[in-house]
Amino acid sequence: LPERYAYYRFPRGVNSVSAPATTSSSEGDQTKELFTEAGISDAARKAFSAISKLEGTFEASQTYDTGYVSIGFIQFTTGPDGDGSLIRALIDEKTASPDAFAEDFHRYGIDVTSDGKITVIDPKSGAELIGPDAVKCIVDDPRLVGVFVHAGRFSIKWKAAQVRAAYKVYWPMDAEITLQLSGNPTVCKVSDIVQSEAGITTLLDRKINRGNIREFPDVVNRIAKAHGCETLSDIQMYEKEIVAAMRYRVDFLKASDLGQPADPPTEGKTSNASRTSDSGRSNRSTASLPSRAAKPRSKR
């Protein structure tokens, strides 16, 4: 590891680096199948796959930063107390595929408690450790990290659990926000405003790495006010400007493999035809999925 790494926290640890989940055609096909079986849209798959290129693949594991133990294709974390997003993925597999969970984790001494904390059997002492003590044990003993690497490489059920948990924890498009339009509060979903693949991926990047998109309503209100927007249809025309303002790690507006928002109208040319009632909006995002439930990475 570099001596001065932005999130470096521990004098020892593991950094299991592997290619992103969509590097080869076979991996890409498997990832697509996992998202399809989970009932998650192709737009969501493309967004998560783009972020995976910044995070890792299903087997990627590291224990050196403020997430403490970071695992998988979008780097789920334990956090210091052993109750972070990784536990959501473990619970998903344990609930949906108990036999696979027993094979992947329980037989190696890794489990989760009923109140959502990770537990491990210390390979050195045989003691059962819970929460913060379990996290420290994983950081200190690479053999426990190896369990996650092995499951990420060979277990289709663990990969599927990662996909489902990632969507449940990090999908930002169904969140409700309140905007000020013509001086009146208007409640809408994020997907009523951002509908392009590049825009969705930009927001997902923030949600995964920062844990939230709390700046989004302020950005939208500022841009809406600057352009005199009175309806959601007006605001939608400025999606590209909104997405540019929400950029985080990567400028996805330059990604040729993602659908892009339209250029905004020339200043002063906002169509009066757009100023119609948005009740019964038919223009809802194609990425607003049929309702499935849905860092700073201490950071998350």
Regions found by a protein language model. Name each.
Residues 1-300:
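Cell-wall glycan-active module
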